[in-house]
């Protein structure tokens, strides 16, 4: 594997689009970035390019939603041809829409099918094929259930890397949002998987809110995936290269990141992208700092207006007290 899962940003539907990933890459050169989940049906039958990304995003992983081995293999070949660094199969999303398509968390109950899907993709690509899963579904939440799933997908499918969302998923009765919050976290269960399967690469996801927490998990596991916190407080990523990967590169200031984002915004605007589609990912950059509310408000109120351009970002930046721009 040419990239590391030591720290990654989770695939988040409606959030981790290519604009978000470009922005996150400015904050950290080493963090592994994931696409939003893309269904095989969208790739095969949909209109538009669902595999588009910026070359600057590497290392970047493409997450698939699907359960047809033939379709997944076809899409995996396309992904490798497009230059993605990793393919990830979603076995963790609990939404009704996903279940109706027979993919996501409900596949935990069909480990042989998941293994077949992974094997089909691995047979046609050279890049890693990984799985993101939960610790259980509904009342199937014993440790034995999880170990059987991991063992089957690893042994029959050849999967060598799993990211475990350390909550179980309720397939009915809870919304996707509630499924990210209500089922209790059980990190020790992920730790035990690593002890029982030491030859596998195991990362954990769910509820991680700081690099300090990430470091604690890394004492037990190979990787940590951060979700909502990385999106809502993106400057968290600014010290990943130094604290998690041990690099000695200087930590970027927030104002520097904004200025580095400007040419990208300008380029996208010239191609017809609306300003708000890019700036929405930047709203949390000054979280918990003086001027943060004014920054968010100015962008939120103005980025959607017809003809909105770089001046909206510059005006919002002017709302931040001068002394704060040095940090």
Curated annotation (Swiss-Prot):
Gene3D superfamilies: 1.20.120.1460, Aldolase class I. The gene is dusA. FMN binds at residues 11-13, 63, 132, 165, 205-207, 227-228. Keywords: Flavoprotein, FMN, NADP, Oxidoreductase, RNA-binding, tRNA processing, tRNA-binding. It catalyses: 5,6-dihydrouridine(20) in tRNA + NADP(+) = uridine(20) in tRNA + NADPH + H(+); 5,6-dihydrouridine(20) in tRNA + NAD(+) = uridine(20) in tRNA + NADH + H(+); 5,6-dihydrouridine(20a) in tRNA + NADP(+) = uridine(20a) in tRNA + NADPH + H(+); 5,6-dihydrouridine(20a) in tRNA + NAD(+) = uridine(20a) in tRNA + NADH + H(+). HAMAP family: DusA_subfam. The active site is at 93 (proton donor). Its cofactor is FMN. PROSITE patterns: UPF0034 (PS01136). It comes from the Bacteria. The record marks 90, 177, 180, 293, 296 as: Interacts with tRNA. Its EC number is 1.3.1.-, 1.3.1.91. GO terms for molecular function: flavin adenine dinucleotide binding; FMN binding; tRNA binding; tRNA-dihydrouridine20 synthase activity; tRNA-dihydrouridine20a synthase activity. InterPro entries: Aldolase_TIM, DUS-like_FMN-bd, DUS_fam, DusA, tRNA_hU_synthase_CS. This is tRNA-dihydrouridine(20/20a) synthase. CDD domains: DUS_like_FMN. Catalyzes the synthesis of 5,6-dihydrouridine (D), a modified base found in the D-loop of most tRNAs, via the reduction of the C5-C6 double bond in target uridines. Specifically modifies U20 and U20a in tRNAs. Belongs to the Dus family. DusA subfamily.
């Amino acid at each position: 594997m040419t990239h590391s899962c030591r720290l990654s940003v989770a695939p988040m539907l409606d959030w981790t689009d290519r604009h978000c990933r470009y922005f996150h890459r400015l904050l950290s050169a080493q963090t592994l970035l994931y696409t939003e989940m893309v269904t095989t049906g969208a790739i095969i039958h949909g209109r538009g390019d669902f595999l588009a990304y910026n070359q600057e995003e590497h290392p970047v992983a493409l997450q698939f939603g699907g359960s047809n081995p033939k379709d997944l293999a076809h899409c995996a070949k396309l992904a490798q041809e497009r230059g993605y660094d990793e393919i990830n199969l979603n076995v963790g999303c609990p939404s009704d829409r996903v279940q109706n398509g027979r993919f996501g968390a409900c596949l935990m109950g069909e480990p042989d099918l998941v293994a077949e899907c992974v094997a089909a993709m691995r047979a046609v690509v050279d890049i890693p094929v990984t799985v993101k899963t939960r610790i259980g579904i509904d009342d199937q939440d014993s440790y034995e259930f999880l170990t059987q799933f991991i063992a089957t997908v690893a042994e029959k499918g050849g999967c060598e890397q799993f990211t475990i969302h350390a909550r179980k998923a309720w397939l009915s009765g809870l919304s996707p949002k509630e499924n990210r919050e209500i089922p209790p976290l059980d990190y020790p269960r992920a730790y035990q998987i690593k002890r029982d399967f030491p030859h596998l690469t195991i990362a954990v996801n769910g509820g991680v809110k700081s690099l300090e927490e990430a470091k604690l998990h890394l004492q037990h596991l190979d990787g940590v995936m951060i979700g909502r916190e990385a999106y809502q407080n993106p400057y968290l990523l600014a010290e990943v290269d130094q604290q998690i990967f041990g690099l000695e590169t200087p930590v970027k200031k927030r104002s520097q990141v904004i200025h580095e984002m400007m040419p990208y915004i300008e380029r996208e605007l010239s191609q017809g992208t609306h300003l708000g589609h890019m700036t929405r990912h930047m709203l949390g950059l000054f979280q918990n700092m003086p001027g943060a509310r004014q920054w968010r408000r100015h962008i939120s109120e103005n980025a959607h207006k017809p003809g909105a351009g770089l001046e909206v970002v510059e005006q919002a930046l002017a709302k931040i007290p001068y002394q704060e721009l040095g940090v």
